[in-house]
Amino acid sequence: MLFSGGQYSPVGRPEEVLLIYKIFLVIICFHAILVTSLKENAGNSSLLSPSAESSLVSLVPYSNGTPDAASEVLSTLNRTEKSKITILKTFNASGVKSQRNICNLSSICSDSVFFRGEIVFQHDDHYNVTQNQDIVNSTFAGVLSLSELKRTELNKTLQTLSETYFIVCATAEAQNTLNCTFTVKLNETMNVCAMMVTFKSVQIRPMEQCCCSPRTPCPSSPEELEKLQCDLQDPIVCLADQPHGPPVSSSSKPVPVVPQATIFSHVASDFSLAEPLDHALMTSSTPSLAQETRLPSPQPTISLTSSPAIDLPVQHVVASSSLPQTDLSHTLSPVQSSIPSPTTAAPSVPEKVVAISTPPGETVVNTSSVPDLEAQVSQMEKALSLGSLEPNLAGEMVNRVSKLLHSPLALLAPLAQRLLKVVDAIGLQLNFSSTTISLTSPSLALAVIRVNASNFNTTTFAAQDPANLQVSLEAQAPKNSIGAITLPSSLMSNLPASEVELASRVQFNFFETPALFQDPSLENLSLISYVISSSVTNMTIKNLTRNVTVALKHINPSQDDLTVKCVFWDLNRNGGRGGWSSDGCSVKEKRMNETICTCSHLTSFGILLDLSRTSLPPSQMMALTFITYIGCGLSSIFLSVTLVTYIAFEKIRRDYPSKILIQLCAALLLLNLVFLLDSWIALYNARGFCISVAVFLHYFLLVSFTWMGLEAFHMYLALVKVFNTYIRKYILKFCIVGWGIPAVVVSIVLTISPDNYGIGSYGKFPNGTPDDFCWINSSVVFYITVVGYFCVIFLLNVSMFIVVLVQLCRIKKKKQLGAQRKTSIQDLRSIAGLTFLLGITWGFAFFAWGPVNLTFMYLFAIFNTLQGFFIFIFYCAAKENVRKQWRRYLCCGKLRLAENSDWSKTATNGLKKQTVNQGVSSSSNSLQSSCNSTNSTTLLVNSDCSVHASGNGNASTERNGVSFSVQNGDVCLHDLTGKQHMFSDKEDSCNGKSRMALRRTSKRGSLHFIEQM
């Protein structure tokens, strides 16, 4: 255009030529500006577009004004290398929108300052930072490159000296350099020159003026910092002769002083203990982070500190050598509290000094050193050693500890355990006259409550409003609480008698900042919540019968898509320095801004009568759990079949033994069903539901014991009190006793205290999760209402069982040897049936002690969970009359019995006729319900004699009569469980000519002798 304009300009008219020339100049300038703008936009677009070769994306690369730091880094790279870099966002701090106000970053971030640093690593540089030899032995797929080594050292240094930091690094392989730009957040007491001493070619600039307002919150993430568009000031210059002194700014304009106001530690505590979501695609940028973290599993105690944790997938990540080389990495990490390694220059700096120029030109110097912190801690320890503390002095100590929590983490780490002991000692030595007392400070809250170990109620400690910390001690946590811990009523139920008097107070602590809980072994994990703890008179309590529930709010509620983990503080980890452990902890519920920590729930049937109430090894607990649930499931199925059979077929339920058996089967079925539901209900940790389930489980257990005892009592009436025994409304009275007495016992326990029931823990599984169960929490209630109750029933049942065995031995002495052999198997089957019917197998619980504990626990679990199955086998499937009813109504074809089949007819070799006066045999030798209840339900008889007693004739015209039929001395042992007793006047064959039957009628007491020739 310039050429064409010059071509057609009129000659001899200088004014017009000059005007056209000016117009051309304006157009040229406009085009130049336009071309420059397009180039910049194209450059930004290329940076914002993802690269196919990049295997790792930097979430927050920062850029500043002119000259841009990222541009300087990128300018050193060639075209191919630039294509490997993927930048999602740029941080433009040069342009400030006119419609927004400019404020100082220090005015909204109290006690914290931000710096921007730039450093270039050369291949032949020798830094005063020694290389960590663990890098060579790390789990990276290949040998670490120069960029990875230098980036690791930079990461470790920033991790030690700063609160939060962000790194952007780019490798220029052509120039053999590594260019890194980082942003750090430091406590105002930290001297930034200590960082400059570590690396010799670093340039650090303060970040002060930003687009913000006084109401703008302090940035806690790279995105928030980017939105503020902070401008960079002139680089800081440290004096050569005073490398650890105050930094001197090269700018003539003063730097505003950081006001001493509210603490910014909420942000520092906002990061969780967590692992990256995808371990396969990410490795650590530091040697210690390259390996997967494995947590030990110490036994948890009540002296615990809990916090949920959350995965941060962008932490400490670089590309593995097996993937395409990534030239850009991003690190977001809180400081890990640990003693500074010799690989950094931090330990050589005994005192951190920061000098900040005030607007008038004055200098304010804040100092913080290890000797100073140790002196303060020692002073408090000395005061605590003198004895009890008055509330005023204790409050001053709490405030002092609160201030110390905001000291540089590198200086605070060696004193962390001592400070935790100081906090516990304050609560232990605190002298107060009321029931409860609470002391609060900006970053620490402490509450102590006097308790009675023998009558401890459920207590919840909750903290509210982190800006103005308040605490409460109630039965339930308030809705607006930011952290709460609930101690169950069974907390001290297992304490030895010598420690009951010592457990006089419970202490709760709430830490607004996790400064004392830095775990160097979890470098890729960080906290997302506050920290809450509890202890009982500074003692350790193990084997809690009910879990402790911890609910903690997330400081940053936007992290909902990340995986959380519940952890507690183990004082014995890391060589006594303490560390986070997830042993036995799991997440019950996770919401947008809250995590509730609890544990998984399974249990063994042996818990119901675990007299020792001690925990089993995890592997054995798992095996017992499988046996328990399989056995309970099978028993429930076969008990249901037994109930349906006896209820559906009227002919087999007319006698008393059958009716008692129906009641026992119903009780056992309900017991098994409630037991199977118990662990599932316990998962929800709902107090009301758990108490209800525990009450029903207790009730049906006692009902089952009672009906077993009534079976034995019925046998006593039939075998011992044979004559002159008449009970009106026999079954009705049995039902009142069988279902009523357990209800009275459970009602008394509930009236005393509903907290006698609840969630209890009875051991651990191999994965570390505790075995929790809704059951009786009080040991006194357990031993009286379960163990004592069962002992009475068990003694009665064993006595009756012995009577049966004695009767069997007496009769067998009269039998011939050949006849004894033929009945041995039947007798054994009868004994086995009585063993399960009377609950003799429950006696295994009395032997589950000492070295044989495990063996009898297995026997207990196997036989008692299968009790319903064995009852079905011996009292349903093995009974001839029951099988005939099945064949008659359930089978078809040849297996089905004819309608006119006399199912109850007894076939004998010597007896061809039946008389109406013949005695009637019943299944359990029981009392007859009426004169018409004549159907036989005999289980086992001698095959050489009568298969079944006749059920076709009337035994007596009186109600509740007892009939006994004797044939040649053959005793049906099962019949001895009820109302039948067989004897003979002489030993003869089954077809003998003379038989005698003894019949008693309850009203007349007369004897009828029927002799058949």
UniProtKB/Swiss-Prot annotation:
The GAIN-B domain is annotated at: 457-615
- Gene name per UniProt: Adgrg2
Q: Where is this region: Stachel?
A: 604-615
Q: Which family does it belong to?
A: Belongs to the G-protein coupled receptor 2 family. Adhesion G-protein coupled receptor (ADGR) subfamily.
The name this protein carries in UniProt is: Adhesion G-protein coupled receptor G2
* Signal sequence coordinates: 1-37
- Assembly and interactions? Heterodimer of 2 chains generated by proteolytic processing; the large extracellular N-terminal fragment and the membrane-bound C-terminal fragment predominantly remain associated and non-covalently linked. Interacts with CFTR.
What's the main place this protein lives?
A: membrane
Q: What does this protein do?
A: Adhesion G-protein coupled receptor (aGPCR) for steroid hormones, such as dehydroepiandrosterone (DHEA; also named 3beta-hydroxyandrost-5-en-17-one) and androstenedione. Involved in a signal transduction pathway controlling epididymal function and male fertility. Ligand binding causes a conformation change that triggers signaling via guanine nucleotide-binding proteins (G proteins) and modulates the activity of downstream effectors, such as adenylate cyclase. ADGRG2 is coupled to G(s) G proteins and mediates activation of adenylate cyclase activity.
Residues where Phosphoserine is found: S1006
Q: What is known of its domains?
A: The Stachel sequence (also named stalk) in the C-terminal part of the extracellular domain (ECD) functions as a tethered agonist. In the inactivated receptor, the Stachel sequence (also named stalk) is embedded in the GAIN-B domain, where it adopts a beta-strand conformation. On activation, the Stachel moves into the 7 transmembrane region and adopts a twisted hook-shaped configuration that forms contacts within the receptor, leading to coupling of a G-alpha protein, which activates signaling.
Q: How does it sit in the membrane?
A: Multi-pass membrane protein
Q: Which sequence ranges are listed under topological domain Cytoplasmic?
A: 645-663, 710-733, 807-830, 875-1013
Q: Which residues cross the membrane?
A: 624-644, 664-684, 689-709, 734-754, 786-806, 831-851, 854-874
Q: Which GO terms describe its molecular function?
A: G protein-coupled receptor activity
Q: Which residues participate in 3beta-hydroxyandrost-5-en-17-one binding?
A: N864
For this protein, the record's SMART domains field holds: GPS (SM00303)
Extracellular face residues = 38-623, 685-688, 755-785, 852-853
Q: Which Pfam families match?
A: 7tm_2 (PF00002), GPS (PF01825)
Q: How is its activity regulated?
A: Forms a heterodimer of 2 chains generated by proteolytic processing that remain associated through non-covalent interactions mediated by the GAIN-B domain. In the inactivated receptor, the Stachel sequence (also named stalk) is embedded in the GAIN-B domain, where it adopts a beta-strand conformation. On activation, the Stachel moves into the 7 transmembrane region and adopts a twisted hook-shaped configuration that forms contacts within the receptor, leading to coupling of a G-alpha protein, which activates signaling.
Q: Which PANTHER family match?
A: ADHESION G-PROTEIN COUPLED RECEPTOR (PTHR12011), ADHESION G-PROTEIN COUPLED RECEPTOR G2 (PTHR12011:SF264)
